[in-house]
């Protein structure tokens, strides 16, 4: 039974996404439907967590919009995601960056590394 599930889901896995980790700053291009029109909306933020594996893998990105923190969770293999671009690679020592929620201003910065 599990072989059947992995066989079906392996066809739907996307391989066109770049390699990214928590702490990296991403630009996620999402297809948004408004009425009858479909457009691309860009969400740029820091990855604070990745969870799951296979077809059910998700990641959460956080950004500050007009002084308010906004977090959005995306399914990694969703057809609604047009493309993902890595803007900065961050150096962090945790897999889940929930502590960024309580930090403001310069304390919320993440050290950048060159890859």
Swiss-Prot record:
Signal peptide: none annotated. One of its GO terms (biological process) is translation. The keyword rRNA-binding does not apply. One of its GO terms (cellular component) is cytosolic large ribosomal subunit. The keyword Hydrolase does not apply. Keywords: Ribonucleoprotein, Ribosomal protein. GO terms for molecular function: structural constituent of ribosome. InterPro entries: Ribosomal_bL19, Ribosomal_bL19_CS, Ribosomal_bL19_sf, Translation_prot_SH3-like_sf. Pfam families: Ribosomal_L19 (PF01245). Belongs to the bacterial ribosomal protein bL19 family. This protein is located at the 30S-50S ribosomal subunit interface and may play a role in the structure and function of the aminoacyl-tRNA binding site. This is Large ribosomal subunit protein bL19.
